[in-house]
Amino acid sequence: MLEEALEHLVKGIVDNPDDVQVASRNLRRGRVLEVRVHPDDLGKVIGRNGRTARALRTVVGAIGGRGVRVDLVDVDHVR
């Protein structure tokens, strides 16, 4: 449910919604939602001074609780 909600929010922000991917990983300290977008859209998802990314984290945290973390993955720099 969280993955779908986050994916829906991010798709509304970006210019290339077909390239949005949200993956979930469970760790000892909670859950991590990794967001991957088209490289041209990364700046939009981060926002000025990180405001958009912070807002996304706040919304997901309100829905999922404290054990959920949202990470934005830069696909240009992944090995």
Swiss-Prot record:
Cell compartments where the protein resides: Cytoplasm; Cytoplasm, Nucleoid
Q: Which organism is it from?
A: Streptomyces coelicolor (strain ATCC BAA-471 / A3(2) / M145)
CDD domains xref list: KH-II_YlqC-like
* Gene3D superfamilies registered for this protein in UniProt: 3.30.300.20
**PROSITE patterns to which the protein is assigned, alphabetical:** KH_TYPE_1
**Gene name of this polypeptide:** khpA
> What is this protein identified as?
RNA-binding protein KhpA
Q: Which domain of life does this protein belong to?
A: Bacteria
State the GO CC annotations: cytoplasm; nucleoid
Query: What's an example of a GO molecular-function annotation for this chain?
Result: RNA binding
